[in-house]
């Protein structure tokens, strides 16, 4: 197996890679019913999804030899922290079917949360306000 890296998804290309990953991963799987790509893009669009009025996200992609092999979103929701009086972060949009990839993605989320002063991480969530 090649070298595994995890990095923030940058720009429109990174967003597209983040959204497209499960479509490539599960292509040909007869039991996978894919959501509409446009609905997934809208969930992550800071101008369309009202969640992002009071929350921030960082999208991470795991790559092995340059190929996307996993993804996760790190999310901080200011409204949740205010209402519930707790300093927690969330993770969502998690895709990994390899233990090493899963561990690397969750390690990045945990490190991000610690650096932001969060006391815990909760998830997975799907990027809606519910």
Language-model-derived ranges and their functions:
Residues 1-47, 90:
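Short amphipathic alpha-helix that is part of the acyltransferase structural core
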Residues 48, 75-79:
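Alpha-helical subdomain
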Residues 61, 67-76:
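Conserved beta-strand in the GNAT
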Residues 45-64:
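A short helix-loop-beta-strand connector motif used in the catalytic cores of GNAT acetyltransferases and
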Residues 2, 55-58, 70:
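Short beta-strand or tight-loop elements
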Residues 82-130:
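Acyl-donor binding region in acyl/amide transferases
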């Amino acid at each position: 197996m090649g070298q595994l890296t995890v990095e923030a998804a940058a720009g429109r290309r990174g967003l597209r890679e983040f959204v497209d990953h499960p479509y490539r991963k599960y292509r040909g799987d007869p039991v996978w019913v894919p959501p509409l790509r446009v609905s997934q893009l809208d969930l992550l669009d800071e101008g369309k999804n009202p969640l992002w009025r009071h929350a921030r996200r960082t999208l991470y992609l795991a790559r092995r030899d340059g190929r996307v092999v996993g993804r996760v979103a790190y999310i901080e929701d200011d409204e949740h922290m205010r209402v519930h009086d707790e300093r927690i972060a969330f993770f969502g949009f998690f895709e990994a079917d390899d233990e090493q990839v899963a561990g690397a993605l969750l390690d990045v989320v945990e490190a991000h949360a610690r650096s932001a002063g969060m006391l815990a991480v909760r998830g997975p969530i799907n990027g809606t306000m519910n």
